[in-house]
Curated annotation (Swiss-Prot):
Its cofactor is Zn(2+). A motif ('HIGH' region) lies at residues 12-22. GO terms for molecular function: ATP binding; metal ion binding; methionine-tRNA ligase activity; tRNA binding. InterPro entries: Anticodon_Met, Met-tRNA-synth_bsu_C, Met-tRNA_synth, Met-tRNA_synth_2, Methionyl/Leucyl_tRNA_Synth, MetRS_core, NA-bd_OB-fold, Rossmann-like_a/b/a_fold. GO terms for cellular component: cytoplasm. Its EC number is 6.1.1.10. This is Methionine--tRNA ligase. It comes from Fusobacterium nucleatum subsp. nucleatum (strain ATCC 25586 / DSM 15643 / BCRC 10681 / CIP 101130 / JCM 8532 / KCTC 2640 / LMG 13131 / VPI 4355). The gene is metG. One of its GO terms (biological process) is methionyl-tRNA aminoacylation.
Length: 636
């Protein structure tokens, strides 16, 4: 494993304000960066702003500023938001900086010297907002931008072109040989399909406006914004400015770009082709996340449903907001932001599960030992089970974090929290406290809980640094928990004899949801085909999370579901293809399944259960469960 780690967000358009989508990407980058630091790696985390282009020039003019003054004015909007979200980046890059201009000029010179740039003329439909030309084969006769929906402009101008088509085969080969180059793998297939349609050469210059980086070998031309913007990653790593830094954080790092799925084409096609031409190492992984809706609807200013991160952290706290975004949706799929969802997570996961574990532990230690650690050498099998489970949790978290499965990593940590809560019920400290001969055993139990809580605080620190530190402080340890490494917490002897624990104080206060009036209509009850309760109890129904969905080969009606039932991944075949043509949208949904049916084979595929559905005049629908309910929850 490489010892260095480089992670980036996209650089955001300076014209806009940060929103829940950009906050999501940047929080994710912050979390993965903090995690890799805890793994003992040297890390570099860069975010920043894309400050060139026609629309920046136009916005500056409309507001009475020069382009540079306009970008200077807009920059604090992003820096202040990231500070409010407790994001600790190593570099905030602006494309107007001299170091970046130097890097862009250098990569252009390298690519040009290789013979991969030529002069031509471009005529096509252009989106000013997205600063992108679109060939007719992407428009299907429309004059609307396929990305933002705005009207396209027919533009004809002299331009310099990059021979991107030359690198199509080399890029396909690289993607094939590096399975994790594009994540999730569904995006990988999308990119491969696009490349196989035939790559066109890329227009990389403009001469109809002036706000950009001049091209030395093309007087009167400035660099096309994407060729400019994408280079920011190597600029930050030290390209053409700090050779040692570049060697460390690009050539000898695991290099990861976190992006939204709308810009996957630029990052997974244009950027790698540029690097192939320049002879520079390609990134190790390009990870594209989904979009967020709000209360089930697309966010838009006209609807008034855009989620403002400032409002959310004011209501729920910064850590609850960070936790919810990364727990609620798998990183590669779309997510829905809802008031009910975040309150449910805060009350259930944070206040009930974690908060109660901390309060119970500290309360009992104060009651039984006056809040002072008493050492004990008594060990029972259940203690070893807890320690063994923690080791497994660390391994699973490492596996999920490597693949950017933030939600699965958090779910794994919460299983350990649940296990410690159950450990209290199993060991019954209140009963041990009544017997003086059991005081040593009581101390051993309480110490397991304190040690476990400190380890939990360490594991959640990348996600919730402020709350993790509060837990540490309440356990009587004031050192900065975000600076610890995994080696610092692997032993179960952190708390020494005489150590004084702190005072318990609620970290996650519960939020009450206003109860809606429930109107019941009484009808005469008739039961047809009654089932004996003993027979019904034989059926085991669980909440399962849909991990992936595909069509069954050779069967138009069948879908193959990969689900997680809280313990195991299983495959279930269901005849739902007709009712879910966009079946990939089902990924990350929680549904109900019968999990103790005899396995059966359908069209050569093993089905290990049955998904429960409803049927009415509108068709057949899966029974979807609130995402706050854990996979594996039993329906009874």
């Amino acid at each position: 494993m490489k010892k260095n780690f480089f992670v980036s967000t996209p650089i955001y358009y300076v014209n806009g304000d940060p929103h829940v989508g950009s906050a999501y990407t940047t929080i994710a980058a912050d979390v993965i960066n903090r995690y890799n630091k805890a793994m003992g790696m040297d890390t570099h985390f860069v975010t920043g702003l894309d400050e060139h282009g026609q629309k920046v020039e136009q916005a500056a003019k409309q507001n009475g500023f020069t382009p540079q003054a306009w970008t200077d004015k807009m920059t604090p909007n992003f820096k202040n938001m990231w500070a409010a979200l407790d994001i600790k980046y190593d570099d905030f890059i602006r494309t107007t900086e001299d170091r970046h201009k130097k890097a862009v000029k250098r990569i252009l010179d390298i690519v040009n010297a290789k013979g991969d740039i030529y002069k031509g003329e471009y005529e096509g439909k252009y989106c000013v907002s997205c600063e992108t030309f679109f060939p007719e084969n992407q428009l299907n006769g429309s004059n609307k931008c396929p990305d933002c929906g705005k009207d396209l402009t027919v533009l004809k101008e002299e331009s310099y072109f990059f021979k991107m088509s030359k690198y199509a085969d080399a890029l396909l080969k690289h993607i094939d040989e590096h399975p994790d180059f594009i994540l999730p793998h569904s995006r990988r297939n999308e990119v491969i399909s696009f490349i196989k349609q035939g790559l066109q050469d890329l227009s990389i210059s403009r001469n109809t406006f002036s706000w950009g980086i001049p091209i030395d070998f093309a007087p009167g031309h400035i660099t096309y914004v994407w060729f400019d913007a994408l280079t920011n990653y190597i600029t930050s790593a030290g390209f053409e400015n700090d050779e040692n830094k570049f060697d460390k954080f690009w050539n000898n790092s695991r290099v990861v770009h976190l992006i939204g799925k709308d810009i996957i084409r630029f990052h997974a096609i244009i950027w790698p082709c540029m690097l192939l031409s320049a002879g520079i190492k390609l990134p190790d992984s390009i990870v594209a996340h989904g979009w967020w809706t709000s209360e089930g609807e697309k966010m838009s200013k006209s609807r008034g449903n855009v989620v403002n991160p400032y409002d959310e952290i004011k209501k729920y706290g910064v850590d609850a907001f960070r936790y919810y975004l990364l727990r609620e949706a798998n990183f590669g799929t779309d997510g829905d932001y809802s008031t009910k969802g975040i309150i449910g997570r805060l009350n259930s996961d944070l206040a009930n599960d974690l908060g109660n574990l901390l309060n119970r532990t500290l309360g009992m230690y104060k009651k039984y030992f006056n809040g002072t650690i008493v050492s004990s050498s008594t060990v029972e099998p259940i203690d070893d089970e807890i320690k063994s489970m923690f080791n497994d949790v660390v391994k699973d978290v490492e596996k999920y974090m490597y693949l950017f499965e933030f939600s699965r990593a958090l779910e794994t940590i919460w299983k350990f929290i649940s296990r410690l809560n159950k450990y209290i019920d199993e060991t019954m400290p209140w009963t041990l406290a009544k017997n003086e001969a059991k005081k040593a055993r009581l101390a051993a139990v309480m110490n397991i809980l304190c040690e476990g809580l400190y380890k939990i605080a360490f594991l959640i620190a990348p996600y919730m640094p402020e709350s993790a530190q509060k837990i540490s402080n309440q356990l009587g340890i004031d050192k900065d928990i975000t600076n610890l490494k995994f080696d610092d917490i692997k032993e179960w002897s952190i708390f020494k004899e005489g150590h004084k624990l702190g005072e318990a104080s609620p970290i996650f206060p519960r939020i009450e949801i206003e109860k809606e009036e429930i109107v019941e209509t009484k009808k005469e009850l008739k039961i047809e085909n009654p089932v004996d309760i003993k027979e019904f109890n034989k059926i085991e129904i669980k909440v399962v999370e849909i991990l992936d969905v595909d069509k069954v080969e050779g069967a138009d009606k069948l879908l193959k579901f990969k689900v997680f039932d809280g313990e195991f991944e299983r495959q279930i075949i269901s005849g739902l293809a007709k009712f879910y043509p966009d079946f990939k949208k089902l990924i990350s949904e929680k549904v109900l399944a019968v999990v103790n049916l005899k396995f059966t084979k359908l069209k050569g595929e093993i089905s290990q259960g049955m998904l429960l559905t409803t049927e009415d005049k509108n068709g057949v629908s899966l029974i979807k469960i609130d995402k706050t309910v854990e996979a594996g929850a039993i329906v009874s």
